[in-house]
Swiss-Prot record:
It comes from Escherichia fergusonii (strain ATCC 35469 / DSM 13698 / CCUG 18766 / IAM 14443 / JCM 21226 / LMG 7866 / NBRC 102419 / NCTC 12128 / CDC 0568-73). Its cofactor is FMN. Binds 1 FMN per monomer. Its EC number is 1.6.5.2. NCBIfam families: flav_wrbA (TIGR01755), PRK03767.1 (NF002999). This is NAD(P)H dehydrogenase (quinone). Pfam families: FMN_red (PF03358). GO terms for cellular component: membrane. InterPro entries: Flavodoxin/NO_synth (IPR008254), Flavoprotein-like_sf (IPR029039), Flavoprotein_WrbA-like (IPR010089), FMN_Rdtase-like_dom (IPR005025), NQO (IPR037513). The keyword Transport does not apply. Residues 4-189 form the Flavodoxin-like domain. The keyword NAD applies. Substrate binds at residue 98. It catalyses: a quinone + NADH + H(+) = a quinol + NAD(+); a quinone + NADPH + H(+) = a quinol + NADP(+).
Length: 198
């Protein structure tokens, strides 16, 4: 059995929705045990509420537990072309895992969201840098998801990983095409994890 963690941060629910789709895709793979968790919120509760943050039910992960999984699919909103501060804070606590090589050889993939599309690919590739320092095997999705060829509408999604465009005010929710790409990413990564560890 390959253990797959979908680990995300979501303030307004866009990445949470994408995380559920990633997990749904991963759960299609026989021999994959899929867990969905989120990183801790670092914003004070009053400010989080004032900013319109969405309460989420996924359990909170600890950095130490990352060593328990064969594959980790990270989801983060874009903050100026980088991962969110909450995800950065979480990953900055993995120094002990780095020192022991606990994540070396584990699969890693990334999905993201942006307000207007700017920085979605940069967010994924800049997150890869941290994962590479851990010796994780980076898994992009390429162009196997056919939705990536559809240019008839505004759509997130890249060969690096699934993305969604939330709109400047956050009112746009992930489209069916974006969720389909996210499901593909989960299924693809889980399938590789089972082949390597199952």
């Amino acid at each position: 059995m390959a253990k797959v963690l979908v680990l995300y941060y979501s303030m307004y629910g866009h990445i949470e929705t994408m995380a559920r789709a990633v997990a749904e895709g991963a759960s299609k793979v026989d021999g994959a045990e899929v867990i969905v968790k989120r990183v801790p919120e670092t914003m004070p509760p009053q400010l989080f509420e004032k900013a319109g943050g969405k309460t989420q039910t996924a359990p909170v992960a600890t950095p130490q537990e990352l060593a328990d999984y064969d594959a980790i699919i990270f989801g983060t909103p874009t903050r100026f072309g980088n991962m969110s501060g909450q995800m950065r804070t979480f990953l900055d606590q993995t120094g002990g895992l780095w020192a022991s090589g606990a994540l070396y050889g584990k699969l890693a993939s990334v999905f993201s969201s942006t307000g207007t599309g700017g920085g979605q690919e940069q967010t994924i590739t800049s997150t890869w840098t941290t994962l590479a320092h851990h010796g994780m095997v980076i898994v992009p999705i390429g162009y196997a998801a056919q939705e990536l060829f559809d240019v008839s509408q505004v759509r997130g999604g890249t060969p690096y990983g699934a993305t969604t465009i939330a709109g400047g005010d956050g009112s746009r929710q992930p489209s069916q095409e974006e969720l389909s790409i996210a499901r593909y990413q989960g299924e693809y990564v889980a399938g590789l994890a089972v082949k390597l560890n199952g």
